């Protein structure tokens, strides 16, 4: 009894502090790299920097179970342009380096599953860990293990994670405020070690002026069963200050709890932004119109959210969240990389309402007009959500989003080999279903899910310099845009003093800043004027030529109609074509793709499109938001490239081509200063 009380006292004294509220400045431990050749260059007109703020490495439980053994440090090396080889022997390298990067492993069970895989560790000796033992060693890494890993990920992981510890663990959890201390399959030391590894990698790879490495992680949560709708966020820290332990769903599973925690640690010196992703798969949860407890949204909610969550991922590997054909039936380009199922629930439909950013923009304007604030005044970024430590943005060099999807066969884009199809067909029907065996067009494929993934996306930030501080402030003010993986350069401005400007003016950008506002900002229309918009896009030198520029207008009609509305305007066409004044559409420029070799039209499209535009339907009494969408000429989708290399016909149900694109953050035009 005395020993028990002594142990209890030690636990109380050593573990009573909430580590999520203990902030440390890690710059004091790790030397910041500076060298003469990396002198920081500042551009008052701002330069565009491309990067990825959503990357999973071997420390994420799901990435590890899918074969990822690549460390956070190696992930940053990849972002800098170095060659990295994954556990399946796939050689991964970017065509050109990125400017910034954040490893964002799941805070949930970060660094713990590889302990389950080690039979010599304390956790590896627990009952139920045997199927995980040596899972990423030797012969266990072959393609045939894919179906086994799916079961481990979707079933065994949850059962093991739910096992409770004894009384001592429960007492420790009470005093530490970390309920995971009461979980048998959790080890706080392993968890903190992985978190520290992520911080150390970011600090050591951060090179101000040359390459920015952000400290970050993913807050992973969802609604209770049976809905189980996910609303995950990545948390990106401004500098070197971060908590001793990441705040996870076990600390609070609702986003209001996350935002409140962000407020608390900001007061302690650790500023951060949360960026939600896969709203398309959230079953209406990311942009719901109420608190998590059912109360209606009010201005306090809107302020809390916008203070902590000014951005959203508009595209990534698991689909695009701009809009859905059901929400935008008049938008011919709405059906782009749509993934209709819930995150992690491949057979359950995700309700488009409350799941897409265009509708959210309109709902935010409606809430604002009702005096409840605008919780959806959001800017856009793209990201990869790679679980391979290394994102694959290039359609012609796509190597999957996880280590085990490194082969075309495992991605489902080419038929299974005869031997593998025979093996899977010999399994019981339920095992065949779990393994994803699918017979289509007289051929056998490994499921449908892999082909629904996209080679997407990237975040673009307009910033004075390539440093944490400058990039973070740009993200805070929403001067950002997202792309589907290409590096289109895109400017978007609005102002009332652009009448004397022309698209060919010298110092056009400086004048646009001086006389108006950039993407992500508010334009207050005190004099009821019709603003002019400046849109300027340049093609990715490694991508296809540009086909058209579009402005999407979103507004709320607060008259007797009380309805949200949207309209797509083409504002600039390639190849000397003109926008039809009635349909507001460019004629087809005739660009095509040769599906025998994926070559594209060389004489169609533009290297650059630049124009001024005014809304022909402008009504000064209605608040509206406007954002730009840039479309490239069509190119082969990655799945078509896979089939072409394998010498087989592409799958009939998978799109053969895509139009890569970019989306600017919106500009909000308000009739008064209440914005």
What are these regions (language model features)?
Residues 128-174, 576-589, 597:
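Low-complexity, serine/threonine/proline-enriched polar segments
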Residues 17-72, 76-135, 184-187, 198-209, ...:
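C-terminal functional module detector
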Residues 238-239, 557:
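Short acidic-glycine loop/turn motifs at beta-strand connectors
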Residues 257:
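Acidic, metal/ion-coordinating pockets
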Residues 13-15:
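C-terminal motif of bacterial Sec signal peptides marking the signal peptidase cleavage site
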Residues 181, 185-192, 204-207, 220-225, ...:
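A conserved hydrophobic secondary-structure block that centers on an alpha-helix together
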């Amino acid at each position: 009894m005395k020993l028990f009380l002594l142990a209890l006292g030690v636990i109380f004294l050593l573990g009573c502090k909430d580590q999520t509220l203990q902030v440390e400045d890690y710059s004091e431990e790790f030397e910041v790299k500076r060298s003469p050749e990396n002198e920081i260059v500042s551009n008052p007109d701002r330069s565009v920097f491309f990067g990825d703020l959503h990357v999973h490495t071997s420390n994420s439980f799901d990435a590890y179970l899918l074969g990822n053994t690549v460390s956070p440090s190696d992930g940053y090396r990849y972002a800098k342009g170095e060659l990295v080889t994954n556990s399946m022997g796939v050689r991964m390298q970017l065509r050109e380096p990125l400017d910034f990067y954040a490893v964002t492993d799941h805070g949930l069970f970060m660094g713990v599953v590889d302990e389950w895989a080690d039979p010599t560790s304390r956790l590896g000796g627990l009952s139920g860990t045997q199927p995980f033992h040596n899972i990423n060693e030797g012969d266990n890494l072959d393609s045939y293990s894919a179906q086994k890993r799916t079961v481990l990920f979707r079933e065994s992981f949850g059962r093991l994670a739910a096992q409770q510890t004894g009384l001592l663990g429960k007492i420790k959890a009470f005093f530490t405020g970390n309920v995971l201390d009461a979980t048998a399959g959790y080890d706080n030391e392993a968890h903190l070690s992985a978190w520290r590894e992520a911080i150390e990698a970011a600090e050591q790879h951060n090179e101000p002026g040359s390459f920015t490495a952000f400290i970050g992680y993913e807050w992973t949560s969802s609604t209770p069963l049976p809905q189980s709708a996910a609303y995950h966020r990545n948390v990106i820290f401004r500098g070197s200050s971060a908590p001793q332990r990441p705040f996870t769903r076990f600390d609070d599973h609702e986003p209001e709890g996350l935002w409140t925690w962000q407020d608390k640690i900001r007061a302690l010196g650790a500023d951060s932004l949360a960026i939600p992703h896969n709203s398309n798969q959230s079953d209406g949860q990311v942009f719901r119109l109420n608190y998590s407890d059912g109360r209606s949204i009010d201005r306090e909610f809107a302020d809390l959210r916008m203070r902590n969550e000014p951005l959203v991922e508009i595209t990534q590997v698991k689909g695009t969240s701009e809009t859905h054909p059901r929400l935008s039936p008049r938008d011919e380009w709405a059906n782009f990389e749509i993934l209709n199922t819930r995150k992690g629930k491949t057979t359950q439909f995700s309700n488009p309402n409350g799941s897409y950013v265009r509708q959210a923009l309109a709902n935010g304007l409606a809430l604002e007009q009702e005096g409840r604030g605008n919780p959806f005044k959001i800017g856009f970024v793209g990201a990869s959500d790679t679980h391979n430590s290394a994102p694959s943005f290039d359609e012609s060099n796509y190597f999957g989003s996880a280590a085990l999807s490194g082969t075309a066969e495992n991605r489902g884009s080419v038929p299974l080999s005869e031997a593998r199809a025979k093996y899977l067909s010999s399994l019981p029907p339920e095992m065949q279903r779990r393994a994803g065996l699918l017979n289509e067009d007289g051929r056998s494929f490994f499921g449908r899910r892999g082909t629904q993934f996209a080679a997407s996306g990237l975040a673009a930030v307009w910033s004075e310099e390539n440093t944490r501080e400058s990039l973070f402030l740009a993200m805070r003010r929403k001067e950002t845009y997202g792309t589907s993986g290409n590096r289109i350069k895109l400017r978007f401005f609005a102002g009332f003093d652009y009448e004397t400007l022309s698209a060919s003016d010298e110092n056009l950008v400086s004048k646009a800043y001086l006389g108006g506002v950039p993407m992500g900002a508010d334009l207050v229309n005190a004099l009821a004027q019709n603003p002019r918009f400046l849109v300027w896009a340049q093609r990715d030198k490694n991508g296809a030529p540009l086909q058209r520029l579009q402005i999407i207008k979103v507004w709320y009609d607060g008259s007797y109609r009380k309805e949200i509305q949207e309209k797509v305007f083409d504002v600039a066409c390639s190849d000397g074509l003109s926008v039809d004044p009635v349909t507001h559409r460019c004629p087809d420029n005739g660009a095509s793709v040769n599906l025998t070799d994926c070559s594209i039209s060389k004489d169609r499209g533009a290297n650059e499109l630049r124009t001024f535009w005014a809304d022909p339907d402008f009504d000064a009494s209605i608040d509206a938001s406007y954002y730009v969408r840039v479309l490239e000429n069509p190119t082969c989708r990655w799945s078509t490239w896979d089939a072409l290399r394998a010498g087989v016909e592409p799958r009939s149900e998978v799109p053969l081509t895509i139009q890569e694109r970019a989306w600017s953050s919106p500009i909000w035009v308000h009739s008064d200063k209440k914005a």
